[in-house]
Amino acid sequence: MSSERPVYPFAAIVGQEPLKLALLLNAINPQIGGLLIRGPKGTGKSTSVRALAGLLPEVSVVKGCYFNCSPSDPTNMCENCLATHRRDAKLPETHRRMRIVNLPIGATEDRVVGSLDIEQAIKLGIRALEPGILAEANQNVLYIDEVNLLPDHIVDMILDASASGWNTIEREGISIAHPSRFILVGTMNPEEGEL
C-alpha cells in the first residue's frame, strides 16, 4: 500500500491553459526561472502544481548524496561528490523522477538552508550538518504554497539560491556550499496579502 496521496492527473485539468503551459515550459526548461501563480482560493493553483509531478522527467543523481548532485556535471557538485569525481572519475548514480518538494509555510531558516545536526554533536562530539529543503530541492521542483505569507528573509534566501544555483550553509564555524538548482513555483491568493 502506497503512503503517497493520490494526485489529480495533469491532463484532467480543464481550462487553465496559460497556467498549464507555463508549468510545462518550466519543466522543459528550468532556466526560465520559475513561476508565480496568483488567484483566488479554489481555482486549482495547488492542484495544477501537484499534478505536474506525473509529467516530470527522470534525473540522474549521485547515489547517497544528501544534495542530489548530478553525477555527470562537475560544476554542479558538492565538495564530497567533486572530490570523489576527481579521484575515481565515475560516481555511483541512480535514476529517479523529479519530485515536487513542498516548503511548509512555517519553515524556519535552519529548515530551509540547513543546520548543524545537534544529535550527532551531542552524542558523538562531531560537527555534522543536517541538509535543508534547498538541498532536497536540487534537481526538483520547489513548491511554495501561499508564498506571500512567508517571512521576507526566507523568501530572500530562496531567491538567492534560485538565482545563483547554490546554497551555502554556515553554522558554528562550518561552511558548506552545495548546488541548489530547482524549478521555483509559488502560489498566492492576493486576498491574503501581496508579496
Which residue ranges define each predicted feature?
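Conserved ASCE/P-loop NTPase catalytic core
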Residues: 2-195
